[in-house]
Amino acid sequence: MSVFRHFCPRTYVLYLIYVTFFLLPLSPMLFYLSLVPAVFLAWMDKKTPFQCGPLGKWGVGFLLCSFLSIAVSPDISFSLFNWLFEPCLYMAFYVLILTYIRNEEEQKCVLKAIFLGAVCVVIWGIVQYADIGGMTQNLYSGAWVDPARFPLLQRRMFSTLENPNLFGAYLLMVISLVIPFLLEKEKTQKKVLYFILLAFLVFCLALTYSRGAWVSALALVIALTVFYDKRFSLLFLVVALILSCYHGQLTERFISLFGREDTSVGLRMALWESTWAMVEEHPLLGIGWGAYWLVYPDYNFFIQNMNVVIYHAHNMYLQIPAVVGIPGAICYFVFFFGHGWVAKKAWKNGQGLTKWLGLSGMFITLAMAVNGMADFALFSRSISFYFWGLSALCISGMNIGKEKENGGKE
């Protein structure tokens, strides 16, 4: 009995949070081995009240709307199971971070786990792309290229993230997290390591050939120009110089954004038209959480092969209202963009790590918002857990500041 009397769930929850952040990009399933026990231990921890943050009510509103949408799903049992293991666990992970990350040392431990995971993912991506031992053939990388449109593009880097677009979204979030720490005025040896990591992240981002990720990266440059230093606008001259002088597959992929010759561009436009029809016909509850792939065949006018399964609309702004209805979409987007607003307040008013995490939070929200215009990377469990986890981490400093103020008053 004495063992249980001195048992401290909080310590174990913290370690499990660190492990979860490390495992998230490495496997779409492995991180559950640390996340589920963390949720269970937090539930047992009666001494620590849960914190939902300033935007929690909007998150709860989205959970409620998505739950109600299950009633109109063509497969209620599937939608319910999906709802329990995706949005509910996203929210649980989000709450865990806001509840248990209480000081800068704990924030730094999370960052170490994130950066260590990023190093592993980058190394694996480079080894994979180098085609050591015929790895690209074994991993079916050819499934993500269009040889008819891009005959010289033989493979795209995707590392551990299932496909290149998801890998691009992951890289954008880590890049957004790294950049602010390079902007600190203090010269430290860590900045050299951050710069090396950033260089490899950008290198890998280029080799994903993910056009949506590239456009999102340009949006980050605009944000740096607006919120930090106008000299960052010079980076656009570098991009223009590369596009004008280099005529390889990078340039071809980028220019293809502005035409419908590429099959993926035409497919997206057709998907958006079909998804908009879903929103028009089901404005209140949507078509049911997780049911897009079940309902899409009824709206399909583009894809001739009936064996092709379409899981999402490749557009966040259409996907969400389509599956949960317009009220649910309002809750979702207030919750989503609200993190950028709260992070901006942390950037303007915070001190130390809270300030720089605030800037990271702004960049992460912006990157995923732009990326969501032509894709829906948050469909992936790993990417969604990562995004909401980072969003919570980047505003967790606001809770730390409040605790310090309350402690001072006492």
Short names for language-model regions:
Residues 25-33, 82, 159-171, 321-325, ...:
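Membrane-interface micro-motifs in multi-pass membrane enzymes
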Residues 77-78, 82, 161-164, 209-212, ...:
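Membrane-interface catalytic loops of GT-C/OST-like multi-pass glycosylation enzymes that act
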Residues 36-42, 231, 359-410:
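Transmembrane alpha-helices of multi-pass inner-membrane enzymes
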Residues 71, 123, 129-132, 208, ...:
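A membrane-periplasm/extracellular boundary helix in multi-pass inner-membrane enzymes
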